[in-house]
Amino acid sequence: NFIQNKEDYTFELYDIDPKCEKAIKRDTLENPPCYDNKFVLTNPPYLARNKNKSKELYDKYNCNDLYKCFITNLIDSNCIGGIIIVPLNFICSIRKADIELRRAFLEKFTLNTINIFEEQVFDDTSYAVCSIHFVKNTTGADIASKIKTHIYPSNKVIDISLKLENNYTIGGEIYNLPVSCEYKVERATKSTKNKENITNILLKCIDDSLDSQLGFKMVSDEERYIDNTENLSARSYATLVITPNISIEQQTLLVKKANAFITEQRTKYNSLFLTNYRESNTIARKRISFELAFMICNHILGLN
């Protein structure tokens, strides 16, 4: 039903494990077909480097996930457009290498429509995914033009821009917040020297459910979380260390304002500026980085 006049087109079908008699058995990452002057419709494999024993393809494309290897192939081709189904992090990740991949893709192609699926789509992966309709940019159109984005199952429709000013990231303007030089915000670890500046502000970095989302809260001295792991590798919780130290009253006000700011941004951008947490359940769970959380606190402290 997608193509009405099929007789006017030539189709090529490739699959590493063909289920259709017309499909050609082929590993299209190991041995890519020619995409030049073709419309590509596919759902490439998603598999992170650290989940795969074989590192050959990751080394070949200098990528850390198989779907990014495919994206690299598209960028290097003369493809005229297509529809791809890829992890949502392709348009949300704030990793430097991912931003660079997104920039290269956007310089080559114009994104016409994005569909975001916040419920699990595939039985074999809990990744939040999106489908992207793109065409080759032949007119030099503004890379920052708005992209119509549909979100399911809520049926929300938003316009997004992916441009240099927001690091080609949805809601990426938040990473350019002005911050105060007067305050330093970090987290409490076994290496923390200025113990007197350890606050009673606990940062929860991952959504658990609709009723237990990421954010800040005041806790007792006994509930403060100190990262005592060998390599300081804890990423789910952090107790803030603020220099110079601030009073309990100031801490309480900071928690209130920081949570309100995060809620405002999550509503504005449908939480898409936050990294997707793979194990989603009743909601599309998100993760906030220490760096962004500390930046938000520093920004708010500087406003007072």
Q: Where on the chain are the PLM-derived regions?
A:
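Conserved S-adenosyl-L-methionine
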Residues: 1-38, 42
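A short acidic (Asp/Glu
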Residues: 1-4, 22-24, 51, 93-97, ...
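Short, solvent-exposed loop/turn segments at secondary-structure junctions
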Residues: 18-19, 45-47, 89-91, 121, ...
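Short acidic, S/G/P-rich loop/turn micro-motifs used as interaction or catalytic elements
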Residues: 46-49, 89-93, 191-193, 246-247
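Mobile active-site "lid"/loop adjacent to the S-adenosyl-L-methionine
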Residues: 47-66
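Conserved Class I SAM-dependent methyltransferase catalytic core
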Residues: 63-120, 126, 131-133
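Flexible, glycine-/basic-rich loop-and-beta segments that form/coincide
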Residues: 125-189
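C-terminal target-recognition/interaction regions appended to catalytic cores
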Residues: 192-304
